[in-house]
Amino acid sequence: MKRLFLALSTLLCITSVSAGNSEYVNPFIGTSNFGATHPGAQYPNGLASVSPFNVAFGGDTNPTKKDDSWNSRGYIYENGYLTGFSHLNLSGVGCPEAGVLLLMPTAGKLMLEAEKYGSTYSNEQAKPGYYQAFLDKYKIKAEVTSTLRTGLSRFTF
């Protein structure tokens, strides 16, 4: 009887802890009003931090672009035009670290200018360690995550 009680108690404890506090985290907090954070995928103390980059082109969908006055961030919540995903970011400092080498899934003819190859996006979702968005122009679902030593991207065409 004691073993059964111990087994049931252990099972109850494991199931009650499994959800954790991460379900209450909103990665979009701090991505407006010069908060300088990004909603991208980060692993605690990891080497890679994969984040959307939506400040390269102003236009109508991006009211704020990179290097406008004080702005040096790689992501701004109010912007709606994505030009890729950066894998080297420090959230909270207001800049992509070590330069910006963007990974951008596209289809069709190769275009090199950000205002041409970029895309508006929808269905943006973020939770700790995961980010996704749907690239409207190319009809591509982009998902990114990170591990201790690398960032992983999955693009569904």
Regions found by a protein language model. Name each.
Residues 20-157:
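Accessory carbohydrate-recognition regions in carbohydrate-active enzymes
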Residues 4-15:
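Sec-dependent N-terminal signal peptides
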